[in-house]
Swiss-Prot record:
Species of the source: Orycteropus afer
Quaternary structure (record): Component of the ATP synthase complex composed at least of ATP5F1A/subunit alpha, ATP5F1B/subunit beta, ATP5MC1/subunit c (homooctomer), MT-ATP6/subunit a, MT-ATP8/subunit 8, ATP5ME/subunit e, ATP5MF/subunit f, ATP5MG/subunit g, ATP5MK/subunit k, ATP5MJ/subunit j, ATP5F1C/subunit gamma, ATP5F1D/subunit delta, ATP5F1E/subunit epsilon, ATP5PF/subunit F6, ATP5PB/subunit b, ATP5PD/subunit d, ATP5PO/subunit OSCP.
Protein name according to UniProt: ATP synthase F(0) complex subunit 8
N6-succinyllysine PTM positions: K54
Gene Ontology terms: cellular component: mitochondrial membrane; proton-transporting ATP synthase complex
An MF annotation (GO) of this entry: proton transmembrane transporter activity
Length: 67
């Protein structure tokens, strides 16, 4: 059974990594980034849940127990 020749693997893998790095860098250089990023002000909104606006049975006085 013949042996697998792995001699060109190193240069193939190395050239693939270098090519991917160059492609990635060229794609990232197309984007414009702000020089001094400013923090974004977030508006906090208050949401009223239905159980906060109406009375429920746990807030009512205890009812009389009928025996």
């Amino acid at each position: 059974m013949p042996q697998l020749d792995t001699t060109p693997w190193f240069i193939t893998i190395l050239s693939m990594i270098i090519t991917l790095f160059i492609l990635f860098q060229s794609n990232m250089s197309k984007y414009l980034y702000p020089l001094e990023p400013q923090p974004k002000t977030l508006k906090t909104q208050l949401y009223n849940a239905p159980w906060e606006t109406k009375w429920t049975k746990i807030y009512l006085p205890h009812s009389l127990h009928l025996h």
